C-alpha cells in the first residue's frame, strides 16, 4: 500500500439542507459515500446534530424517530443507520455528535483549567471543538462526508456552518466541497416547479461565507432544462452540478439515480481528480429485486409507535433487505397493539408471519401478548425483538405454566413473579462493572452496544446463523429475562437458544415451525448487501410456510 493510501489527505464533502427539514440529507450523504466506496475509495461519514441534547437516547420516538445503536454502544441519530446500511460498514460514536456534546466537552475542559483562564466563546472555542471532531472522524480516510442536520438559517446550526467555512479556508478549495440539498416545490394548482426557495436558501448560505458547488434539487418530477439553467445561474454553480433528485420508489435507488445524474463528475473536478467510476452491478441487481420481486409475504408488525414509523426505521429496512435477497416483497401489515387489546386479534388472520418489535413502557403490552399467543397457538412464524422476546416469555409463563402474576418489573416493580427483572450489575462494553437501580438516570444506563452470544447446538436460532456457535449482536435495554424461571420454561418447551455470560439472549419453541425471541436488536446489523440472518430466516420461513399452506 502506498504512503498516500496509508495517510491520505482527507477530502471533505459537507452536506447541508435548505428550505425545510426531512429532505433526505441522510440518504444523499449515504448515496454519495456509497458511490465513492464502490469506486474503491476509503470513505468515512459523519452526522452532526445541532440539538442541545447530549444524545437522542432519552428523546421520545415521536419527537426524534428511532435511536440507532452503534457497535460501541453509542445512542445515535437514525441517519447513522442509513450510513451503515448503505456502506455495509460499522461506524462508532465518533461518527455522530451533537451541540450538547460539543458544549459539554468545552465546559468540562474549562472547569479543569484547560483554557488557562481565557474567556470561553463560540468563536474560537466551540468552533475549534467542532473542527477537531470533524477531523477526528476523517482520520485515515480519503473522503469524509459530513451531514449537518437541520436547515440553513436555524440559529443552532450557525457554529457548525462557521466551522465549515473555516475548514474551507484552512484546507483550501481542493479539499472541501459544499453540497446543498434543497426543495423545488411543485405548485399543483399551476402545475409549476418553483426555484425561488432554493435561490433564497443559497443566498443565506452565502451570507455566512459558504458558496455551494453542488445543488441537489429534490423534486416530485423531472426538472426541465430551463429550470436547471436558472438554478445554475441563480446559485452560481455549473450546469452539471445541478443534480435532480426525484422521488424514488426505494431509497436504495438513489445512488443509482445520482450515478445517472453524474454527480461524481463535479466532485472529481472540484478535487482535481481523474474520472470516478463506481461498480454498482450487485447493488443494481438487489434494487431490481426490491422493485420487481417474484414472491411476496405479509408480515403483521405489532407495535405502538405506528403514527411515526420512523421509530422502527432500522427494522423496516431490515425487512426490505431480507426481501430483496429472497426476491420477495415484504408487505407490512401495521397492527396497533392497543387496537388488538380493545378489538381482538382479527387483524392477525391471514398473515404469513408476526413480528413484535422492541419498545418501552406498559402501554400496548396486553395487545402484543395477545398477538404472541395467537402466533404460538396457530403455528404462525414469529419473531420477537427485545421487549418482544420478554413478552413472549411472560405470555408463556402465564398461559402455559399457569403463573397468573407473571410480569416484568418494568411494568410492576413489586410483582411477586418477576419473569423479567432489572439486573443491577453487569459488565459493560469496556469490561467495566456497571450498577443500576430503579433510581438510576435514564440516559446512558442501559446495556448498550455489541455483545457476544453463544448459540445452542441444534437450535433453530443457530441454524438461522448458518451454524455459528458464537455471534455478536447489539443491545439497548435495561431489563433481562430472569434465569430463575429458566428450568420451568424449558421443561414446558420454551428453550433458551442463546445466552451471554449467564444472561438469556434468545428463546425458541420446540413444537413450533418457527418461533424465536431475541433480546438483542438484529435490525441494527442488517444491510442491503448483508441482511441479518435471523430476520432473513424469519422472512424465509414465512414464505415457505405460506407456500405449503397454498399448495395443501
From Swiss-Prot:
Annotated ranges, domain Glutamine amidotransferase type-1: 298-548
Describe activation and inhibition of this protein.
Answer: Allosterically activated by GTP, when glutamine is the substrate; GTP has no effect on the reaction when ammonia is the substrate. The allosteric effector GTP functions by stabilizing the protein conformation that binds the tetrahedral intermediate(s) formed during glutamine hydrolysis. Inhibited by the product CTP, via allosteric rather than competitive inhibition.
Query: Which UniProt keywords are listed?
Result: ATP-binding, Glutamine amidotransferase, Ligase, Magnesium, Metal-binding, Nucleotide-binding, Pyrimidine biosynthesis
Keyword set includes ATP-binding:
yes
The record's annotation in Pfam families points to:
CTP_synth_N, GATase
Query: Binding positions for ATP?
Result: 22-27, 79
Q: Which reaction does it catalyse?
A: UTP + L-glutamine + ATP + H2O = CTP + L-glutamate + ADP + phosphate + 2 H(+); L-glutamine + H2O = L-glutamate + NH4(+); UTP + NH4(+) + ATP = CTP + ADP + phosphate + 2 H(+)
Amidoligase domain, as annotated region: 1-273
Which pathway does the UniProt entry assign to this protein?
Pyrimidine metabolism; CTP biosynthesis via de novo pathway; CTP from UDP: step 2/2
PROSITE patterns referenced in this protein's UniProt entry, alphabetically: GATASE_TYPE_1
Give GO terms for biological process: 'de novo' CTP biosynthetic process; pyrimidine nucleobase biosynthetic process
So where does UTP get bound? 21, 194-199, 230
Q: Does the keyword Nucleotide-binding apply?
A: yes
Residues reported in the UniProt entry to bind Mg(2+): 79, 147
Could you say which EC number(s) this protein's record lists?
6.3.4.2
Instruction: State which residue ranges cross the membrane.
Output: none
Q: Name one GO cellular component term.
A: cytosol
Please tell me where L-glutamine binds in this chain: 359, 387-390, 410, 478
- Record: active site: 386, 521, 523
- What are the binding positions for CTP in this chain? 21, 154-156, 194-199, 230
Mind telling me which PANTHER family this protein's record contains? CTP SYNTHASE, CTP SYNTHASE-RELATED
Supply any other comment: CTPSs have evolved a hybrid strategy for distinguishing between UTP and CTP. The overlapping regions of the product feedback inhibitory and substrate sites recognize a common feature in both compounds, the triphosphate moiety. To differentiate isosteric substrate and product pyrimidine rings, an additional pocket far from the expected kinase/ligase catalytic site, specifically recognizes the cytosine and ribose portions of the product inhibitor.
Which family does the similarity line name? Belongs to the CTP synthase family.
The annotated subunit structure for this chain is:
Homotetramer.
Its biological purpose: Catalyzes the ATP-dependent amination of UTP to CTP with either L-glutamine or ammonia as the source of nitrogen. Regulates intracellular CTP levels through interactions with the four ribonucleotide triphosphates.
What is the protein name for this chain?
Answer: CTP synthase
Amino acid at each position: 500500500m502506498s504512503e498516500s493510501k496509508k495517510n491520505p489527505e482527507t477530502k471533505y464533502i459537507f452536506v447541508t439542507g435548505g428550505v425545510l427539514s426531512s429532505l433526505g440529507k441522510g440518504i444523499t450523504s449515504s448515496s454519495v459515500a456509497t458511490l465513492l466506496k464502490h469506486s474503491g475509495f476509503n470513505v468515512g461519514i459523519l452526522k452532526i446534530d445541532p440539538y442541545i441534547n447530549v444524545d437522542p437516547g432519552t428523546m421520545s420516538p415521536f419527537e426524534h424517530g428511532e435511536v440507532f445503536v452503534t457497535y460501541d454502544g453509542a445512542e445515535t441519530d437514525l441517519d447513522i443507520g442509513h450510513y451503515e446500511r448503505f456502506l455495509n460498514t460499522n461506524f462508532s460514536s465518533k461518527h455522530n455528535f451533537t451541540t450538547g456534546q460539543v458544549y459539554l466537552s468545552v465546559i468540562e475542559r474549562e472547569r479543569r483549567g484547560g483554557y488557562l483562564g481565557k474567556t470561553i466563546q463560540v468563536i474560537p472555542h466551540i468552533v475549534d471543538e467542532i473542527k477537531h471532531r470533524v477531523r477526528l472522524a476523517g482520520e485515515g480516510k480519503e473522503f469524509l462526508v459530513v451531514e449537518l442536520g437541520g436547515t440553513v438559517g436555524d440559529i443552532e446550526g450557525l457554529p457548525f456552518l462557521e466551522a465549515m467555512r473555516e475548514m474551507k479556508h484552512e484546507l483550501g478549495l481542493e479539499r472541501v466541497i459544499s453540497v446543498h440539498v434543497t426543495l423545488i416545490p411543485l405548485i399543483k394548482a399551476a402545475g409549476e416547479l418553483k426555484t425561488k426557495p432554493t435561490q433564497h436558501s443559497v443566498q443565506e448560505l452565502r451570507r455566512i461565507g459558504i458558496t455551494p458547488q453542488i445543488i441537489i434539487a429534490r423534486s416530485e418530477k423531472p426538472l426541465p432544462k430551463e429550470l436547471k439553467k436558472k438554478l445554475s445561474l441563480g446559485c452560481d454553480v455549473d450546469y452539471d452540478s445541478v443534480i435532480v433528485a426525484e422521488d424514488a420508489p426505494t431509497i436504495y435507488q438513489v445512488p443509482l439515480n445520482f450515478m445517472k445524474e453524474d454527480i461524481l463528475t463535479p466532485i472529481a473536478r472540484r478535487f482535481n481528480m481523474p474520472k470516478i467510476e463506481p461498480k454498482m452491478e450487485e447493488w443494481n441487481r438487489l434494487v431490481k429485486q426490491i422493485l420487481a420481486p417474484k414472491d411476496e409475504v405479509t408480515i403483521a408488525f405489532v407495535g405502538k409507535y405506528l403514527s411515526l414509523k420512523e421509530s422502527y426505521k432500522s427494522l423496516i429496512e431490515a425487512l426490505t433487505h431480507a426481501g430483496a435477497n429472497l426476491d420477495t416483497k415484504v408487505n407490512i401489515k401495521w397492527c396497533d397493539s392497543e387496537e388488538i387489546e380493545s378489538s381482538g386479534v382479527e387483524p392477525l388472520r391471514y398473515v404469513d408471519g408476526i413480528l413484535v418489535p422492541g419498545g418501552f413502557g406498559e402501554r400496548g403490552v396486553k395487545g402484543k401478548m395477545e398477538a404472541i399467543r395467537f402466533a404460538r397457538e396457530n403455528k404462525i412464524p414469529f419473531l420477537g425483538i427485545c421487549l418482544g422476546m420478554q413478552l413472549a416469555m411472560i405470555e408463556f409463563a402465564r398461559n402455559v405454566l399457569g403463573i397468573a402474576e407473571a410480569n416484568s418489573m418494568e411494568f410492576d416493580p413489586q410483582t411477586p413473579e418477576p419473569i423479567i427483572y432489572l439486573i443491577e450489575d453487569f459488565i459493560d462494553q469496556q469490561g467495566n462493572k456497571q450498577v443500576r437501580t430503579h433510581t438510576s438516570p435514564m440516559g446512558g444506563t442501559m446495556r448498550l452496544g455489541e455483545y457476544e452470544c453463544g448459540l445452542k447446538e441444534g437450535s433453530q436460532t443457530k441454524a438461522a446463523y448458518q451454524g455459528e456457535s458464537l455471534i455478536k449482536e447489539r443491545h439497548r435495554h435495561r431489563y433481562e429475562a430472569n434465569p430463575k424461571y429458566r428450568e420451568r420454561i424449558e421443561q414446558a418447551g420454551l428453550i433458551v437458544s442463546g445466552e451471554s455470560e449467564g444472561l438469556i439472549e434468545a428463546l425458541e419453541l420446540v413444537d413450533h415451525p418457527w418461533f424465536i425471541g431475541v433480546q438483542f436488536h438484529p435490525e441494527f446489523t442488517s444491510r442491503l448487501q448483508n441482511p441479518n440472518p435471523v430476520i432473513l430466516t424469519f422472512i424465509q420461513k414465512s414464505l415457505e410456510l405460506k407456500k405449503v399452506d397454498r399448495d395443501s
